């Protein structure tokens, strides 16, 4: 199954919506947003070739939970969200067309920055490259057919 970044982000948003009704945005927005809310930010990853016409892709995502500044129970809110993310993000649902599967989440870590929670995850996918027919090979096949006739 090939992957789509938007389908991966949708799967993460689906998991977050199981425990929170806060708005979820795909990336930091220039528009005015009302905290508390979540942002799903893509971080640098990597791609490397593998055998059997496949490649291995690292997808890194930073899930940012923003909360209103100077609230009384800010620490409690952050740790509640952190616990929920830890419980819900072992795997994420992934659907392309009629196919649904689960993707395992790796390298989960978090840190606080100005009382905003950054929960970083990694996904590892192996993707089969689309096969491109070599034109020379097909030309050789045509020549062999002509010789046999």
What are these regions (language model features)?
Residues 34-43:
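A short, hydrophobic beta-strand-centered structural micro-motif
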Residues 1-25, 46-149:
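Charged, amphipathic alpha-helical segments and their flanking helix caps
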